[in-house]
């Protein structure tokens, strides 16, 4: 985001509290865009402590109609090595300590999550990734774990048996809340490691994850 010269930081309050950080307002290709770091600047907020409802509500207040989520993930498949991107189209929600709906107090609402991402936004993400010559896969299932700990070997092998593609900690309930708020959503997952299942690679190492994450950030 440092490359954007015309920058304004906006502070927003919501009925759900404050979002993770002030929201950056800028322009790209003459279009107004917003950026919100879900972990806060400096990466200070644990996945379980992210105020997802405030984040989505703040973006809704700003008139945001489309969200492109970018996140670091572990790979659950041999053909998805570190450095590759996955344009996710499905999720399996394994979180348990997060507020997951706007409709939990004196009102009930149901929304379909059969197809949680926007195909149109996925097309836009794919075009941008192709333009940068980044290796990627279109489509894939993202296991969302609670964290902040990484998987046990048994958990990693279980998720592989489910034919999931990647594992991370942040896209739920984000995608569910975006759907409730009627905001189109797409997810680009940047692979940093092989989780802990791969016999020829070491278990998840924070320093190695950070190294690949920084490389992926340059691509993004």
PLM regions: where:
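Short, hinge-like loop/turn segments at secondary-structure boundaries
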Residues: 84-89, 184-187, 203-206
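A C-terminal functional module that forms or caps the active site or interfaces directly
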Residues: 153-194
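Generic non-transmembrane alpha-helical segments
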Residues: 120, 124-135, 219
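Active-site/ligand-binding-proximal alpha/beta "capping" segment
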Residues: 128-165
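General beta-strand structural signal in soluble alpha/beta enzymes
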Residues: 35-37, 67-71, 87, 136-139, ...
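Metabolite-binding pocket within alpha/beta catalytic cores that recognizes anionic/polar moieties
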Residues: 1-113
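His/Asp/Glu-rich mid-to-C-terminal helical/loop segments that flank catalytic regions of hydrolases
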Residues: 196-220
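Glycine-rich beta-alpha junction loops
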Residues: 74, 91-92, 141-146, 173, ...
